[in-house]
């Protein structure tokens, strides 16, 4: 069974349709896949610990645009590398400017931009070699090398012992060993001289005059007093103009991402307020029985508010008004005669 890990950026949590779409694509390709999802901040802060050699695929979901907004800490890349099995793949919204960090963590960058965990290379094993055994008298024994002592080189000329049978043979051996030593000394002395001559190389001879003639040296953005410019000049050739343009684009990208987050949060708050307005309490005529006594057919708690002050309670809102019928508009027009 294939195990897949979804690493969600915090902004991807607000877009439920995006996460649902990715899960449906996974289920269409791998119906028996075991999908686990975590927010990448919790993994980076080690609140959630991932087990080593567990997941076959890790999919990183980050809806933000721009390489700056998709960068991953090197420590997080190492955690993801350890959680993958051999030949495991990390794919999704990966930053293309962090391929070197991925390679340093152990990944291999694929042709489609995916990061692949390679198989472990087998360790080298040292094989001990047995010494050659020499059979002596039917039994194998380990023999040490034997050495022969050289005779003195200051032998008297013309004085030989004719009684010895092997005198000429010994002289031939001594002469051949002398020649061998002389040839070895001559060989090594000549080779040392040649090495010393080869090691001393003038670096100026490696550069031809044709190449140095057409070199273009960029002009430094410096003021006459030796101080550097704060801003790039009009015809900048030292690269300061490109650095400023990159900084400006990074700032604008960061501002756009912050504004997008603010817009998304404002939309969520507006939706919550609309839902609260839909659930607001509204009263109908039946619910206003104890509130508005002028509605026809409605009576107060004492059922005598319309009869007059003699029948009204102490806290009745109609104290001082003449008797009326329920539903009748009460108007007072006779105050002009008393004035």
Curated annotation (Swiss-Prot):
Q: Origin, by domain of life?
A: Eukaryota
Q: Where does [2Fe-2S] cluster bind?
A: 221, 233, 236, 238
The segment annotated Fe-S binding site A runs over 221-238
Residue window of motif Cx2C motif 2: 313-316
User: One GO term of the cellular component aspect?
Assistant: cytosolic [4Fe-4S] assembly targeting complex
**What does UniProt say about this protein's domains?**
The C-terminal domain binds 2 Fe-S clusters but is otherwise mostly in an intrinsically disordered conformation.
Indicate what this protein is called per its UniProt record. Fe-S cluster assembly protein DRE2
